[in-house]
Structures are given as structure tokens and as C-alpha cells.
Amino acid sequence: MSFSVQIKHELATNPLIKTEWSSFLAGYFQNGLKLLATGQWSFKTSTATLKALFSNALQFSFQIHETSTHCEFSFRASQTEVDQLLAFDATQSDLPLQKAYVIGAFLSGGSVSDLLHSSNFHLQISTNNELQIKQLMKLFHPFKQTTKRHQLLVYVKSYQAICDFFKLVEAFDGYLAFEENQLQKNFALEQVRKSNLEIANLMRTLKTSTSTAEQLKILINSADFKKQSLNFQRFCLVKLDHPDWSLEQIAQFFERKYKVQITRSGIQHLNAKLKKLNQN
């Protein structure tokens, strides 16, 4: 089951549909209702949940024709009843009716990309009813309007806008699944970023250590090295053997190995002298 079908299944079971049935029906019919040559009205559903919904709640006498891809309902109703639904303006209604209308519009012509397995954020409602397009633009301000393959549609392509739409139509299961998936993706990306940063820092450290070691070897093998103080010579040899030691560890080693007590500032002085000689 695709993520889009999951969302439609959740919306089709929303209690608002039953309590605000006329508004929902207007949202659905303004999108896909057709007048047949027989004088009957016809609309299609694409999921078993929608088929069950209309089979149980549709108040008109109807027939069902099923294919491998959809289920087509045909029914008879007075022109007045149908005109009222097709002319319904949800923007003049209260919030529950507006939500039911948008749910109907989405169930009729809406789709959403596979937000759980793709980075492509896209939600749209397609319809050739200009009245419906205008209403949807007013009812959900982030919507943008375009035409694709001679079909009018409204759409959003941002993570936040899709989350807001799910909250508007009360698709809370879909919203939470989408939100959790994004948190997991963001966490994974953050871990990769941290790992890359740690690797970069390690490479810089290794490069610096290698450079320092080469400089130390050159200094130790030079004639000037033997002219330096004994403590400085010892310091250089310790730095060569233990490049990762802190100044405090070197001071402790001096006391343990050479029985020489040297302060931290003394070690810092030797380290500064080494840097100065390397620069020269």
C-alpha cells in the first residue's frame, strides 16, 4: 500500500465525513462528477475504503460497476440537488465544514508522494473545476496553482506545508509517520555529518603529526641539536616518540624517567622553543 493510499484510507474513516456529509460530498463531486447519456450522474473511487464509504452513506439509489483499477458509481438525482452540491462554497462555512470539503476534494483528486521513502515532497489536488481551485487556494493558503496536461491543480512541495495540510484534514497517523520518518532521516544525516567532521579532523591531526615528526627528525639529526640544553633534547625525543602526549604527560614522564621536576610553564617554554626552531 502506497503512502498516498494510506493517507486516503485514514481520511475516508474520518468522523467529519459523516457529521458534515453534504460538505464532503460537495468537495468530492465538484472534482469528478459526470453526467451520463442515460441521465444518471457518475463518479469514481479508487480504493476499497471509499467504495465502502459511499456504499453505506450515499443517499441516492445507485449502481456499481467495478474494473481492475477503480469502482464507478452511477445514480439518479434531481438537478436541483446536484446543483446545490456543485455550487457549494466552503469558504463561507465554519471550520468543520471546510475540513470535510477539503477531505472530499483530496479523496477525489488528491495524491501525495511517497514521503517515507523519498526526498521528493509533493502533495497535489487536481481538478478541472475553477470554483474548487479558488476555494482550495483560500482554504489552504500554502497551495500554489498550475496547469499540467490540460488539468488544473493546486500543490505544495515543502515539508512544513505538507505537515500543515495533514493537520488541517486531521490525517494525524500520516502526519506522525511522516514526522517520525523525517526525524530519523535528520538524525542519520547528522550522524553522517559528525562522522565526516571527525574524519576530517583526524586527517588534519595526522597530517600535522606527520609534518611535526619529520621536522623533529631533521632537527634531532642536525648539528645544532647537540648544542641545545639536555632537557630540550629530551623533550624533542619524547615528542617524537609520543606525539599525542599532552604537556602535563610529558612533565610527568620527565619526573618518572629522568627524575627531573619540571613545571607546566617549563614544558610550555620548551614547546615554544621547538616551534620557533621549526619555523626557522
Swiss-Prot record:
- Write out the coiled-coil annotation as residue ranges: none
InterPro entries per the UniProt record, alphabetical = Homing_endonucl, Sporulation_regulator_WhiA, Sporulation_regulator_WhiA_C, WhiA_LAGLIDADG_dom
**Biological processes, Gene Ontology terms:** cell division; regulation of sporulation
Under the heading Pfam families, the entry gives:
HTH_WhiA (PF02650), LAGLIDADG_WhiA (PF14527)
Please provide, alphabetically and separated by semicolons, the GO molecular function terms listed in this UniProt record: DNA binding
- DNA-binding region(s) from the entry: 246-279
Q: Does the keyword Lyase apply?
A: no
Q: Which UniProt keywords apply?
A: Cell cycle, Cell division, DNA-binding
The entry's family comment says:
Belongs to the WhiA family.
Q: What does this protein do?
A: Involved in cell division and chromosome segregation.
Query: Know the name of this protein?
Result: Probable cell division protein WhiA
Q: Which organism is it from?
A: Mycoplasma pneumoniae (strain ATCC 29342 / M129 / Subtype 1) (Mycoplasmoides pneumoniae)
